[in-house]
A protein has these predicted regions:
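Long, contiguous binding/interaction regions
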Residues: 1-79, 87-113
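Basic nucleic-acid-binding interfaces
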Residues: 84
Length: 113
């Protein structure tokens, strides 16, 4: 898949938490969020931890474990919200899943290039 750039925002990073506390983002700074998301995209570790929490881990589709060692994430505070730029070759479905694990449904996708 071709590399794409995703432009995302989170209104209040201090409230950006996923459904599973043990997998959620725990920081408050844009830099720490960028590092957490970048790690989640570059390796399958977060996905593997999520899979282990499922009632039937063997039934989970392993295609979602794909990672992109070259993924980059930049984040910066802009007024009262955080602007995030993700560059990756991963499909949107994988990015969305990992974002939801880290930040719940607090993020908004604004553009893809």
């Amino acid at each position: 898949m071709a590399t794409q750039r995703y432009y995302i925002s989170i209104d209040d990073l201090s409230k950006a938490r996923g459904e599973y506390a043990q997998l959620s983002f725990e920081g408050i700074s844009p830099d720490s969020f960028a590092a957490a998301l970048q790690s989640a995209l570059r390796t399958p570790a977060l996905w593997e931890r999520w899979k282990a929490l499922q009632p039937d881990p063997d039934a989970i589709d392993d295609s979602m474990s794909t990672s992109d060692a070259g993924a980059t994430v930049k984040a910066e505070q802009s007024d009262l919200h955080t602007e995030i730029e993700v560059t990756t070759s991963l499909p949107h479905s994988i990015l969305k899943h990992r974002l939801n694990l880290l930040a719940g449904r607090t993020w908004k996708l604004h553009d893809v290039k």
